[in-house]
C-alpha cells in the first residue's frame, strides 16, 4: 500500500507519495535526501515513534500506522550550510566585547581547532527534543546555577532557592523565544533540578531541549589557560533551519561561557544567598522586559547586551 506523507523542513512542505508500507525509515530519509540535500545521518524526524521511542532506521513504515498526509517535521542541515556556519567570520567583522575579558581571549572563536571541536559536537552529541522548535521564534539559552536558582544555599525545597519571578519570566519569554536549558553539569542533575523547580511541568511554557556539560568544549586562552565554554555553534549546527547568530541570546552568570559567541551572551547577575536576597532580586523581571523589547528586532547580533539596562531605560523612556 502506498503512503502519502508531508514533510516540513526549513519553512517548506515536501509531499511524498512514492513510499510503501514495506519501506523503512531509512528509505524515507533517502527520499528526503534527494529533495532537500540533507544527509540521512544529519536528519531527525519528529513524530515518528515506535513502541514509545523514536523509530530506528530499520523500522518499516507500515508498523507506524501513519494516517494519509501525516505531517512530519524534519530537522537537519545540508553539509554545505554546516560548513558555512562553522567557518570563522570575515576578518573585517566587528565583534563587541560583551563582558570583561581580555581582547585576545575573544579571538578563540575563530581558531580552527575550536571550530573543529564544535563540528564534532554537532555530529556526535545527541539532543532529545522535548518540544519541537517553533518557526519564527527566536532562541533563549539559559544557564541554571546562579542564573535560575541559588544552588549553594541550604533549604528544605528547591522552591526556596528559586530565583524570584522565574516562572513569570519563562512564561513571558516563551511568547517570543524557544527556550533551551544549558548547564555545565550532568543531564540527570539538570532534569532533577528542572522538575524540582517546576519548570519541566509548567503548563504556561515549554522547554525545547536541554544540554549538559558533554555539549561544551574546552578552549585554550592566552592568560587563563584551558577553560570550558558553551559554544552556540552546536545548536546552530544541529538546527540551523531555526536558530542562528542573528536570533539567539544566552544568559549566564559566567562570562567565559560566551567565549565562542561573545556577541550573543548576556552576563546575568548571579543569584546567591537566596534567603537574604529573595525579596529584592528583580533581575528576571527586568530581563523579561528587555527580551520583550528586542524580540521585535530582525537581528539581535547588532546589540551590545552588556548595556541591556541602558537600552531598556532608553526604550521605556520613548
UniProtKB/Swiss-Prot annotation:
CDD domains: Ubl_UBLCP1. GO terms for cellular component: nucleus. InterPro entries: FCP1_dom, HAD-like_sf, HAD-SF_hydro_IIID, HAD_sf, Ubiquitin-like_dom, Ubiquitin-like_domsf, UBLCP1. One of its GO terms (molecular function) is protein serine/threonine phosphatase activity. SMART domains: CPDc (SM00577), UBQ (SM00213). The keyword Lipid metabolism does not apply. Residues 133-294 form the FCP1 homology domain. Its cofactor is Mg(2+). Its main location: nucleus. Mg(2+) binds at residues 143, 145, 253. NCBIfam families: HAD_IIID1 (TIGR02245). This is Ubiquitin-like domain-containing CTD phosphatase 1. It comes from Xenopus tropicalis (Western clawed frog).
Amino acid at each position: 500500500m502506498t503512503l502519502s506523507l508531508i514533510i516540513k523542513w526549513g519553512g517548506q512542505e515536501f509531499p511524498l507519495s512514492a513510499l510503501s508500507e514495506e519501506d523503512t525509515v531509512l528509505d524515507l530519509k533517502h527520499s528526503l535526501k534527494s529533495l532537500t540535500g540533507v544527509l540521512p545521518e544529519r536528519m531527525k524526524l519528529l513524530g515518528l515513534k515506535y513502541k514509545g521511542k523514536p523509530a530506528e532506521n530499520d523500522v518499516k513504515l507500515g508498523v507506524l500506522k501513519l494516517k494519509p498526509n501525516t505531517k512530519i517535521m524534519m530537522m537537519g542541515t545540508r553539509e554545505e550550510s554546516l560548513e558555512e556556519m562553522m567557518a570563522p567570520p570575515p576578518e573585517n567583522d566587528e565583534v563587541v566585547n560583551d563582558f570583561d575579558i581580555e581582547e585576545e581571549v575573544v579571538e578563540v572563536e575563530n581558531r580552527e581547532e575550536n571550530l573543529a571541536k564544535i563540528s564534532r559536537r554537532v555530529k556526535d552529541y545527541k539532543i532529545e527534543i522535548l518540544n519541537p522548535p517553533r518557526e519564527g521564534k527566536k532562541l533563549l539559552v539559559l544557564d541554571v546555577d546562579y542564573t535560575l536558582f541559588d544552588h549553594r544555599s541550604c533549604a528544605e525545597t528547591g522552591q526556596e532557592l528559586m530565583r524570584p519571578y522565574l516562572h513569570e519570566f519563562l512564561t513571558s519569554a516563551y511568547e517570543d523565544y524557544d527556550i533551551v536549558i544549558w548547564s555545565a553539569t550532568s543531564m540527570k542533575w539538570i532534569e532533577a533540578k528542572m522538575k524540582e523547580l517546576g519548570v519541566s511541568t509548567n503548563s504556561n511554557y515549554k522547554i525545547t531541549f536541554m544540554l549538559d556539560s558533554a555539549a561544551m568544549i574546552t578552549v585554550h586562552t592566552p592568560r587563563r589557560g584551558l577553560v570550558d565554554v558553551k559554544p552556540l555553534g552546536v545548536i546552530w549546527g544541529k538546527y540551523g533551519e531555526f536558530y542562528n547568530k542573528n536570533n539567539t541570546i544566552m544568559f549566564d552568570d559566567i562570562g567565559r561561557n560566551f567565549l565562542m559567541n561573545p556577541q550573543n551572551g548576556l552576563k546575568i547577575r548571579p543569584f546567591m544567598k537566596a534567603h537574604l536576597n529573595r525579596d529584592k532580586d528583580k533581575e528576571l523581571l527586568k530581563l523579561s522586559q528587555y527580551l520583550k523589547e528586542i524580540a521585535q528586532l530582525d537581528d539581535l547580533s547588532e546589540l551590545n547586551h552588556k548595556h541591556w539596562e541602558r537600552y531598556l531605560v532608553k526604550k521605556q523612556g520613548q
